[in-house]
UniProtKB/Swiss-Prot annotation:
SUPFAM superfamilies: C-terminal domain of alpha and beta subunits of F1 ATP synthase, N-terminal domain of alpha and beta subunits of F1 ATP synthase, P-loop containing nucleoside triphosphate hydrolases
InterPro entries: ATP_synth_asu-like_sf (IPR023366), ATP_synth_asu_C (IPR000793), ATP_synth_asu_C_sf (IPR038376), ATP_synth_F1_a_nt-bd_dom (IPR033732), ATP_synth_F1_asu (IPR005294), ATPase_a/bsu_AS (IPR020003), ATPase_F1/V1/A1_a/bsu_N (IPR004100), ATPase_F1/V1/A1_a/bsu_N_sf (IPR036121)
Assembly with partners or alone: F-type ATPases have 2 components, CF(1) - the catalytic core - and CF(0) - the membrane proton channel. CF(1) has five subunits: alpha(3), beta(3), gamma(1), delta(1), epsilon(1). CF(0) has three main subunits: a(1), b(2) and c(9-12). The alpha and beta chains form an alternating ring which encloses part of the gamma chain. CF(1) is attached to CF(0) by a central stalk formed by the gamma and epsilon chains, while a peripheral stalk is formed by the delta and b chains.
Protein name: ATP synthase subunit alpha
Species assigned in the record: Haemophilus influenzae (strain PittGG)
PROSITE patterns according to UniProt: ATPASE_ALPHA_BETA
C-alpha cells in the first residue's frame, strides 16, 4: 500500500495532536551523611525552613538547617536503615497534624497517629503545628475561671481561661498530680483537655491514661504521647502538635485546657537536635533560640474575642469567645528556679505555682509555696464567693511562716502570737487535699467561710481533717439545693453570707466530728 505525501502529513499531524506530554518537576536531593537522627542532604535548593522532606519507606524528615550547599534535617522516627546516597525529595508542605472532636478520648503520637489500639481516628481536617499566635486586637481579657478543684490553688493562685500558669518544682513534688486533677475536674465543665507527655516512661503515660479513664475524664481529653523511647525530634514537636489540637476548639468559640508535661524535657530534646546540627551552644549548652522555643508555644494560649471566632468560622459561630489555657510544667534541680529554662518560662507565663519538696515531704500536699506562687491575671477571673472569702488565707499563711521561724528561737510567746501560730497551723492543715478528690466551688466556699469567720478556733489541730469531711457531708446532705445554686452562680452577697453562716452554726451545734 502506497501512501502519498498528503496522507503522511495528515498522519503525522494526528499523532502530534494525540501526543500527551506529562512532565513533573521534582526537587530532589541525596543523603550525604546520617548520624543520630540527623541527615545532611546535598541538593534541595528550593527547600523551605520547617518543610517536610519525603524519605524512602514512607517516612519524613524536617528541614531545620538551610546552608549554602547542603540541608540539615531531623528524621521523624527510626533512621537505622537510612544510608548515604539515598534519594529524597521536597514535599512543599510543612508538618500538619489531624485535629477535631474525633481525637477526644484517644492516645496519639506527635504526628497524630493513634497508638491506643482503638482503630482509625475520624478527624475534621489537618492543622499546621507551627501557627502564629493571635494578635493583640484578636484577644480578650481573662475573666472566666478554670477551677482546679484544689483549695490551695483556687483560693490563692486562681487560674483564668486563656491564662498561662506555670507549675514548677523538683521531681516528685506532685506537679503531674496537680495537672491531672485539674483535667479530671473539667469533666463536667465543658472544657476540652489536652495532655502532652514529653520524654516520660511509657508505663507512666499508661498509668495517667488509666487514671483519667477511671475518673471519667478521658472522653473529654486528648493524650499526645512522646515517650522517652521516641526520637528527640518527636519530643521537640509534641507540644506544638498538642497546641494545634487545642487551637481547633479555641478558634470555634470553645474552651480548652492544655498541659505540657514537661517543657524541661522538650528543651533538652531541642538542645540535642541543635548540638547535632552544629548550632553554636550558649548558656548551659542550650542554643540561642531556646527562649523563642517556649515563647512561640505559650503565646498561642490565649482568650480570643467574638470577632475572631466569627471570622475564623466564616459566620457559623457568633457571639462566642474561645480560649486555650496552658499549664506548662517545669522540673527544677534542687529547687533552683534561677536556672536558664525555669527563668525563661517564668518570664513568659502569667504566674507560677511553686511546689516545694520540703513541704511535700512534711505531708503538706499539694505542696504549694504561697510565698512565691502567684497568678498575675487570675484574680479577675476568680469566682466572687472564693475571691471574697479567700482574701485572708495568703496573709494568714505568710504571717504564720514568719512567726513559726521566729518562734523556734523564742521560749515564751504572748497569747496573740500563740493564737496566730495556732490559726496558721489550722489553715495549713485545712489546705491539705488528697489526690483525685477535687472540691466544687460551693464546697470550697463553705470551708473558706469556716476559716474566715473563726469557726476553726475551737477545733483541735488533729480534728481538722474530720471536721472538714463532716462539714462537707452535712452541707451536701442538708443544703443540696443551696450548694447547687452556689456552684452555678459563684456569687457572694449578704443573703449567701447568712446562709453560709446558718450552715456553719447548724453544723457546729448538731455535729460531732
Amino acid at each position: 500500500m502506497q501512501l502519498n505525501s498528503t496522507e503522511i502529513s495528515e498522519l503525522i499531524k494526528k499523532r502530534i495532536a494525540q501526543f500527551d506530554v506529562v512532565s513533573e518537576a521534582r526537587n530532589t536531593g541525596t543523603i550525604v551523611s546520617v548520624s543520630d537522627g540527623i541527615i545532611r542532604i546535598h541538593g534541595l535548593s528550593d527547600v523551605m525552613q520547617g518543610e517536610m522532606i519525603a524519605l524512602p519507606g514512607n517516612r519524613y524528615a524536617m528541614a531545620l538547617n538551610l546552608e549554602r550547599d547542603s540541608v540539615g534535617a531531623v528524621v521523624m522516627g527510626p533512621y537505622a536503615d537510612l544510608a548515604e546516597g539515598m534519594e529524597v525529595q521536597c514535599t512543599g508542605r510543612i508538618l500538619e497534624v489531624p485535629v477535631g472532636r474525633g481525637l477526644l478520648g484517644r492516645v496519639v503520637n506527635t504526628l497524630g497517629q493513634p497508638i491506643d489500639g482503638k482503630g482509625e481516628i475520624d478527624n475534621d481536617g489537618f492543622s499546621p503545628v507551627e501557627v502564629i499566635a493571635p494578635g493583640v486586637i484578636d484577644r480578650r481579657s481573662v475573666d472566666q475561671p478554670v477551677q482546679t478543684g484544689y483549695k490551695a490553688v483556687d483560693s490563692m493562685v486562681p487560674i483564668g481561661r486563656g491564662q498561662r500558669e506555670l507549675i514548677i518544682g523538683d521531681r516528685q513534688t506532685g506537679k503531674t498530680a496537680l495537672a491531672i486533677d485539674a483535667i479530671i475536674n473539667q469533666r463536667n465543665s465543658g472544657i476540652k483537655c489536652i495532655y502532652v507527655a514529653i520524654g516520660q516512661k511509657a508505663s507512666t503515660i499508661a498509668n495517667v491514661v488509666r487514671k483519667l479513664e477511671e475518673h471519667g475524664a478521658l472522653a473529654n481529653t486528648i493524650v499526645v504521647a512522646a515517650s522517652a523511647s521516641e526520637s528527640a525530634a518527636l519530643q521537640y514537636l509534641a507540644p506544638y502538635a498538642g497546641c494545634a489540637m487545642g487551637e481547633y476548639f479555641r478558634d470555634r468559640g470553645e474552651d480548652a485546657l492544655i498541659v505540657y508535661d514537661d517543657l524541661s524535657k522538650q528543651a533538652v530534646a531541642y538542645r540535642q537536635i541543635s548540638l547535632l546540627l552544629r548550632r553554636p551552644p550558649g548558656r548551659e549548652a542550650y542554643p540561642g533560640d531556646v527562649f523563642y522555643l517556649h515563647s512561640r508555644l505559650l503565646e498561642r494560649a490565649s482568650r480570643v474575642n467574638e470577632d475572631y471566632v466569627e471570622k475564623f468560622t466564616k459566620g457559623e459561630v457568633k457571639g462566642k469567645t474561645g480560649s486555650l489555657t496552658a499549664l506548662p510544667i517545669i522540673e527544677t534541680q534542687a529547687g533552683d528556679v534561677s536556672a536558664f529554662v525555669p527563668t525563661n518560662v517564668i518570664s513568659i507565663t502569667d504566674g507560677q505555682i511553686f511546689l516545694e519538696s520540703n513541704l511535700f515531704n512534711s505531708g503538706i500536699r499539694p505542696a504549694v509555696n504561697p510565698g512565691i506562687s502567684v497568678s498575675r491575671v487570675g484574680g479577675s477571673a476568680q469566682t466572687k464567693v472564693i475571691k471574697k472569702l479567700a482574701g485572708g488565707i495568703r496573709t494568714a499563711l505568710a504571717q504564720y511562716r514568719e512567726l513559726a521561724a521566729f518562734a523556734q528561737f523564742a521560749s515564751d510567746l504572748d497569747d496573740a502570737t500563740r493564737k496566730q501560730l495556732s490559726h496558721g497551723e489550722k489553715v495549713t492543715e485545712l489546705l491539705k487535699q488528697k489526690q483525685f478528690a477535687p472540691l466544687s466551688v460551693a464546697e470550697q466556699a463553705v470551708i473558706l467561710f469556716a476559716v474566715e469567720f473563726g469557726y476553726l478556733d475551737d477545733v483541735e489541730l488533729s480534728k481538722i481533717a474530720s471536721f472538714e469531711t463532716a462539714l462537707l457531708d452535712y452541707s451536701n446532705r442538708n443544703h443540696a439545693e443551696f450548694m447547687q445554686e452556689l456552684n452555678k452562680t459563684g456569687n457572694y452577697n449578704d443573703e449567701i453570707k447568712d446562709t453560709l453562716k446558718s450552715i456553719l452554726d447548724g453544723f457546729k451545734a448538731n455535729s460531732a466530728w
